[in-house]
UniProtKB/Swiss-Prot annotation:
Intracellular or extracellular location(s): Cytoplasm
Main location: cytoplasm
Keywords: ATP-binding, Chaperone, Cytoplasm, Isomerase, Nucleotide-binding, Stress response
Full protein name: Chaperonin GroEL
Record carries keyword Nucleotide-binding: yes
Family of the protein in this entry: Belongs to the chaperonin (HSP60) family.
InterPro entries documented for this protein: Cpn60/GroEL, Cpn60/GroEL/TCP-1, GROEL-like_equatorial_sf, TCP-1-like_intermed_sf
GO molecular function, one term: ATP binding
Signal peptide range: none
Complex and partners: Forms a cylinder of 14 subunits composed of two heptameric rings stacked back-to-back. Interacts with the co-chaperonin GroES.
Outcome following mutation: G51A: In strain: 85-736
Residues that, per the record, bind ATP: D23, G24, T25, T26, T27
EC number from the UniProt entry: 5.6.1.7
Length: 120
């Protein structure tokens, strides 16, 4: 039963990460697994579970502040292409995404669909 609870927790972490960020599910899953493993190890060694929870919450707050303070807006077509290329692992895809975003604007919507036709 504990394994199922853990698996459901990790599934929920991955789903929430995908819903909010659209990326980073592997990182979120690895972090969740490490938090559970180390949390259980500390509780087994006598740590207070509520103290651990408070410590994790403080760490999350600090990390969030640090990330937000170092974040940079992506504004130019070149920045979009570079960022999308890194995310996709392919600069040509990054260039296509930047071109599509340039055409639809900041408030536009881009829909990507799978195709059975090669090259289209």
């Amino acid at each position: 039963p504990y394994e199922k609870i853990g698996a459901e927790l990790v599934k929920e972490v991955a789903k929430k990460t995908d819903d909010v960020a659209g990326d980073g599910t592997t990182t979120a899953t690895v972090l969740a697994q490490a938090l559970v493993k180390e949390g259980l190890r500390n509780v087994a060694a006598g740590a207070n579970p509520l103290g651990l929870k408070r410590g994790i919450e403080k760490a999350v707050e600090k990390i969030t502040q640090t990330l937000l303070s170092s974040a940079k807006d992506v504004e130019t077509k070149e920045q979009i292409a570079a960022t999308a290329g890194i995310s996709a692992g392919d600069q040509s895809i990054g260039d296509l995404i930047a071109e599509a975003m340039d055409k639809v604007g900041n408030e536009g919507v881009i829909t990507v669909e799978e195709s059975n036709t090669f090259g289209l």
